């Protein structure tokens, strides 16, 4: 069996510069190799193209109606002491977001109620952001811009053993035990530029006269878990549950990396 789906979402904002387009694709399939053996794949991919509005209807409603939008020279009037809602629509703030999520798994029925499942999952995301503020919005009459790049990846490897047993319909036992490995890494870079030659070359940060600031970030984390759960149902009226897990995480303190959680 298999499933394939495609979807498109397109939204035009009520304010200039605020629109969103998203494209999604999904693939899901499962194959019965043997009566006791199954393999499957689930994958989701998406692309988001988003322009973030830098003004709102509230700012337009709050703008004094007796103040001019343009001065006598036909330029935006920035001398009123109030943010010009029309001028602010010329700010640029654009996102490109790519996401891929997928899982590959296998299941095998071992013997009389015992089932083993192993799965490998991945999550990958790329984000690009470009912003630009024209010179007429600056008190120093200088255009400024920035670029931001973000990458995130996560891998999860799960292995579980399930057991289900029913006796005389009055006793039902359901148990699971397993181990899990998880790894996540993120990287980011941001650069800010000042004094562009004009308001049209906003997509090229290298055209700025100076790089006012820059920075990058890196973060990595890991998690190892072993866990177990037992559910016992008596006469379809009473349910008893016993759980426990033992986790080791790089997010814990260096002197206490592991902990038991009943």
Predicted regions and their residues:
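Surface-exposed loop/interface segments of Gram-negative outer-membrane beta-barrel transport/assembly proteins
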Residues: 1, 13-18, 24-101, 117-225, ...
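Residue-level signature of outer-membrane beta-barrel architecture
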Residues: 8, 31-32, 43, 106-108, ...
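Extended, hydrophobic alpha-helical segments in both membrane/secreted and soluble proteins
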Residues: 25-27, 118, 157-159, 224-230, ...
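N-terminal capping/interface segment
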Residues: 105-115, 119-121
């Amino acid at each position: 069996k298999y499933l394939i789906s495609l979807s498109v979402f397109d939204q035009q904002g009520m304010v200039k510069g605020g629109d969103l387009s998203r494209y999604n694709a999904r693939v899901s399939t499962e194959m019965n190799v043997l009566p006791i053996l199954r393999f499957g794949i689930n994958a989701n991919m998406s692309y988001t193209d988003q322009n973030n509005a830098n003004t709102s209807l509230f700012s337009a409603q709050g703008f004094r109606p007796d103040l001019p939008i343009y001065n006598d020279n036909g330029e935006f009037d920035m001398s009123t002491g109030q943010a010009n809602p029309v001028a602010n629509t010329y700010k640029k703030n654009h996102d490109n977001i790519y996401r891929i999520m997928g899982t590959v798994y296998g299941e095998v029925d071992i013997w009389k109620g015992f089932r083993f499942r192993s799965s490998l999952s991945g999550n990958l995301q790329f984000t690009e952001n470009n912003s630009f503020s024209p010179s007429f919005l600056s008190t120093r009459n200088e255009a400024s811009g920035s670029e931001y790049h973000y990458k995130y990846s996560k891998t999860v490897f799960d292995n579980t053993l399930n057991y289900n047993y029913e006796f005389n319909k009055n006793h039902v036992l359901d148990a699971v035990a397993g181990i899990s490995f998880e790894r996540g890494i993120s990287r980011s870079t941001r650069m800010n530029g000042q004094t562009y030659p004009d308001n049209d070359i906003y997509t090229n940060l290298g055209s700025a006269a100076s790089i006012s600031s820059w920075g990058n970030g890196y973060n990595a984390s890991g998690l190892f878990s072993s866990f177990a759960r037992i559910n016992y149902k008596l006469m379809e009226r009473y349910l008893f549950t016993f759980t426990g897990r033992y986790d080791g995480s790089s997010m814990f303190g260096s002197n206490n990396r592991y902990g038991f959680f009943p």
